[in-house]
């Protein structure tokens, strides 16, 4: 939904660019180790979710996709390299934010300049950083009236919002049951 919203904001606004940000935390217990290549080649596997959504919404053969990519209007960056940046005229999608620390999220949101929107997406059930995630705390911090008045919105999906598949809806329901019984 965030990529869809970002692409909608980009359409008809040539001054805006899309920046995809995520962490290089792996979801498996055992990492692959160092990846060969330059920064772009190393980060490319982490861009798979963005590429999947772009393919779904803007197939390879569409002029829109080719134009956005060739003009450099879609780019990606790991959270590690944000310090010092200032974003104007950007639509930022921060994905897998449950794997960002509070400090990393602070770095992310303090890059906001003029005409910038940030979508911070995450699922606290899927954190891979063992209690170090700042995602839930950041959500709580900005889920108030003052933030809403400034245009900061918080939205949490639940099981009824799942569209991927019926089996996934069942799986999430069972995981939530298990989580409630443990707590």
Give residue ranges: language-model regions:
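Conserved helicase motor core of SF1/SF2 NTP-dependent helicases
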Residues: 1-94, 98-183
């Amino acid at each position: 939904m965030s990529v869809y919203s970002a692409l909608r904001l980009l359409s008809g606004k040539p001054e805006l660019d899309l920046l995809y940000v995520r962490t290089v935390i792996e979801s498996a217990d055992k990492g692959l180790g160092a990846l060969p290549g330059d920064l772009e080649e190393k980060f490319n596997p982490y861009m798979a979710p963005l590429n999947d959504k772009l393919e779904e919404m803007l197939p390879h053969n569409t002029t829109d996709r080719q134009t956005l990519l060739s003009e450099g209007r879609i780019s990606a960056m790991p959270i590690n390299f944000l310090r010092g940046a200032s974003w104007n005229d950007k639509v930022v999608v921060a994905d897998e934010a449950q794997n960002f620390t509070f400090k990393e999220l602070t770095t992310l949101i303090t890059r906001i300049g003029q005409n910038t929107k940030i979508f911070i997406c995450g699922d606290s059930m899927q954190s891979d950083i063992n209690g170090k995630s700042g995602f839930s705390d950041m959500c709580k911090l900005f889920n108030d009236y003052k933030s809403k008045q400034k245009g900061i919105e918080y939205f949490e999906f639940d099981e009824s919002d799942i569209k991927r598949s019926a089996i996934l809806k069942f799986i999430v329901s069972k995981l939530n049951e298990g989580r409630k019984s443990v707590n």
